[in-house]
Design a protein with these regions (language model features):
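ATP/NTP-dependent adenylation/nucleotidyl-transfer catalytic domains that generate, transfer
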Residues: 23, 161-163, 220, 232, ...
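Enzyme catalytic cores with a strong preference for nitrogen-chemistry domains
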Residues: 1-347, 365-374, 401, 406
Length: 641
């Protein structure tokens, strides 16, 4: 449960209709197994103590008492278990029968939540036996314990306050205004649904969509435990279709009729983070009673998949769709700016590297969108001390294949003159040696844009902005930055996508060679004609930095949790032992804080995803903020050896 992780399970034991003792034994057996596996929240189906299909037997006092006796059996068994469990039963309160969920933990009955919406259509006749629950909470005595009864109940873990449980039952979710909506606005981060949803053609897909969409709307975790084998098949069949979703993502599911045990870890902190940044999510806890309970705070072993490349869809079709959409967004943003500025040209510094390649591809799309010739894109290559034949050749071929205007400005003489002006010793390959070239290139581009009535298109990407891997007022500056919202790992896939759809074999070949070229600013002299300065050797692997960037910006997680997630995501990768993950995480935080001043004056550029660093939009951070707290937390992370 540390770091907000909650191991949860939706369970569908095999039952016998109206055999409460047998059902209790099945539930206890599964509950004990779940607890042994580290499950801290176990949700069983609607009426699991009796069976859902008892019909008018629910009105029999013998069955009602049998359900209470079965509840006592489960309560007794739970005394030695560190788990919150929810079971369903009929309950007589003030002469009326209710369809209830009992919430229990450590032998204590925490509360009873009645069903709000009773279906009375098609195959369902619940109003024949039951009364809808009320939002008013009252105390009732059940199994010798005085407990709250009502729909406006929440259950909160003292040791992990981000785990707040709300409960609804089957049809409640299928209604126009589910109780879970109010539960989450009152503070619930996890919703448990005890269900007995019979199986019909197409219903599984609809059920899956309901659960996923509700968890997305409510920014919550959602467990759906449905009745399965053992229910009466007189007129219906039940498939034990169990689902667990989190913020719209389906994390675990059992196939209908394939057994009933869905298990995963929910991230309660993630849900809190989503709500904290969403101003449309307005809390309202009026009329709710919160019951506190205790669970031991231990580290939960992660079994849920942690995506090592959170910006990249893994399904090929979805990835292609995502790439096409992003390219259209980038092109549309640039097209609007070119149109508004009455720009005659789009001027791009082309190096033969990934970022400038993507910017050029976007500019070509923008011109086509505007109905203008691609020759209105002016690509400028500016070779200097570190330029290699490979990148220079690729730049020329790319421009020729895209039919854009091309010019070369050798900046070596200008840089020599500039170094002479400022007294820079050219044998000293320091930051001045590197940044001087970058600033001269920007000067050439800006003045070329002035001369041609054009607009300088920036090439820097989101990952470089996060790390500050750009020369202030050099490649950091442009008139419109089309890649500012695109992380480096995604840049590669966008260029790969353009290669995949390229009609020309030569265009495809050069794009693939650009993809195969090491990422480099080429500011230090080449060695034997090869790139001598490789970015990832200096700042670290971009796939790690993009992973860190995602969790820092998207959810505001701290270093220790991000390190834990990274270990899970990159497990089995020999090149990423814990020491390497730690080294580059520390480097990320140090650079991220130190380089904010560059992000405080960024050119305009389109937002394309949920993570971006525009100082006018998603990221407002003072340039002189201290990183001490984050670095101190890093120091507390234990490393083996």
């Amino acid at each position: 449960m540390k770091d907000g992780f909650l191991k949860a399970a939706a369970l569908s034991p095999s039952l016998r209709v109206a055999d409460c003792n047998y059902n209790a034994s099945q539930i206890v057996s599964q509950l004990q197994d779940a607890a042994a596996r580290g499950v801290r929240l176990a949700v069983f189906p609607e009426f699991c103590l009796t069976g859902y299909t008892c019909g008018d037997l629910f009105l029999q006092r013998t069955l009602q008492q049998g359900a209470l006796d079965a509840l006592q059996t489960v309560l007794d068994a739970s005394r030695e278990l560190d788990v919150v469990a929810l079971v369903g039963l009929p309950l007589l309160v003030r002469g009326k029968l209710y369809n209830c969920a009992a919430v229990l933990c450590g032998g204590r009955l925490l509360g009873l939540v009645p069903k709000t919406y009773l279906p009375n259509y098609g195959e369902f006749y619940e109003k024949r036996q039951f009364t809808p629950g009320s939002t008013e909470v009252e105390n009732v005595t059940v199994c010798g314990q005085e407990v709250p009864f009502g729909t406006s109940l929440l259950f909160r873990c003292r040791q992990m306050p981000s785990f707040v449980l709300g409960v609804e039952i089957c049809e409640d979710l299928w209604s126009a205004l589910p109780p879970s909506t109010f539960h989450t606005l009152a503070g619930a981060t996890v919703i448990a649904n005890l269900s007995a949803s019979d199986e019909t053609v197409g219903k599984a897909e609809y059920r899956r969509a309901l659960v996923s969409n509700q968890s997305a709307r409510l920014l919550c975790g959602y467990l759906y435990a449905s009745a399965g084998h053992g229910e009466s098949t007189q007129d219906m069949v039940f498939a034990g279709h169990d689902l667990i979703a989190e913020n719209g993502a389906l994390l675990a599911e059992t196939s209908p009729f394939e057994g009933g045990w869905a298990e995963t870890e929910l991230d309660c902190q993630r849900m809190e983070s989503e709500r904290a940044r969403n101003t449309s999510f307005e809390p309202s806890a009026e009329g709710y009673l919160t019951v506190d309970f205790d669970l031991a705070l231990i580290e939960t072993k992660l079994s849920r998949w942690v995506d090592p490349t959170p910006f990249i869809p893994h399904d090929e079709r979805r990835r292609a769709e995502r790439c096409e959409l992003i390219l259209k967004m980038q092109a549309d943003g640039l097209a609007k700016r070119l149109e508004h500025a009455h720009a005659k040209t789009a001027v791009i510094g082309i190096s033969g590297g990934l970022d400038s390649c993507l910017a050029l591809l976007v500019a070509v799309r923008a011109m086509k969108q505007l109905g203008r010739p691609t020759s209105d894109v002016l690509a400028v290559t500016m070779p200097c001390f570190g330029t290699t034949h490979r990148t220079r050749s690729n730049a020329e071929i790319l421009c020729d294949e895209l039919a854009v205007s091309f010019t070369e400005i050798d900046i070596a003489n200008t840089v020599h003159s500039h170094f002479k002006d400022i007294g820079q010793d050219e044998s000293v390959l320091d930051v001045t040696f590197e940044n001087g070239q970058a600033r001269v290139r920007t000067l050439e581009l800006m003045d070329t844009a002035n001369r041609t009535g054009g607009l300088v298109v920036g090439t820097g990407d989101l990952s470089e902005l996060a790390l500050g891997w750009a020369t202030y007022n050099g490649d950091h500056m442009s008139m419109y930055g089309v890649n500012a919202g695109v992380p480096k790992t995604l840049v590669r896939h966008l260029v790969q996508y353009e290669a995949d759809i390229a009609v020309s074999a030569e265009l495809r070949r050069v794009l693939l060679d650009i993809l195969d070229t090491p990422v480099s600013p080429e500011l230090l002299p080449a060695k034997d004609g090869e790139i001598s300065q490789k970015t990832e050797d200096l700042v670290g692997p971009y796939e790690l930095h993009d992973f860190y960037l995602y969790y820092v910006l998207r959810f505001g997680f701290g270093p220790s949790k991000i390190f834990r997630l990274a270990k899970a995501a990159f497990a089995g990768r020999a090149e990423y032992p814990d020491e390497v993950l730690y080294k580059w995480l520390r480097n990320f935080y140090w650079r991220f804080f130190a380089q904010q001043f560059k992000r405080s004056c960024l050119p305009d550029g389109p937002k394309v995803g949920s993570v971006t660093l525009s100082p006018r939009g998603d990221w407002r951070m003072p340039s002189d903020a201290a990183a001490a707290l984050w670095l101190a937390e890093l120091e507390q992370i234990p490393l083996k050896g």
